[in-house]
Amino acid sequence: MLVLLCATMASQAIAAPVITFYRKQGESYVDCRITMKNGTTNFKHSSNSCSNDDDYYFSISGAEDGVQFGIYNNPDCKENESFATYKTGKGDSNRNIRITAVDASRGLPAGHLIHDTLMSGGRDKSGQLHGKVSCLKVWNAPLSTEDNAAQ
């Protein structure tokens, strides 16, 4: 019985959510996609495909309940410049969270529903964030199928 349960749970393993960043023009101008694993992605000083200081919007595919993330002006995800934080639910029926302004959560209390189970993380700092995105920080992300295979 235990073997069957483990096999069933393994077959239901999830892929990590993916966040897509968009430039000023919106959905038809994708800048980059990042797998949402715990840690930070510095747009300015790393080899990822994201442009520094060019993004205005984001969307998420494969959303998972409880993943938290912040979008920062500071390239090291420090809170000394403008930033906004979020927490995800499972998204719509297809586990997607539609296109959202990078600063949509600012000024909202923690847990405030923005749309599609996307909530405010309750922490932010004022100042221009749209067109100034330099870092993504993710925490509370579940282990994906790839992470489990590496262990």
Language-model segments: residues:
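Compact beta-sheet-dominated domain cores in extracellular/mature segments
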Residues: 13-151
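Sec-dependent N-terminal signal peptides
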Residues: 1-9
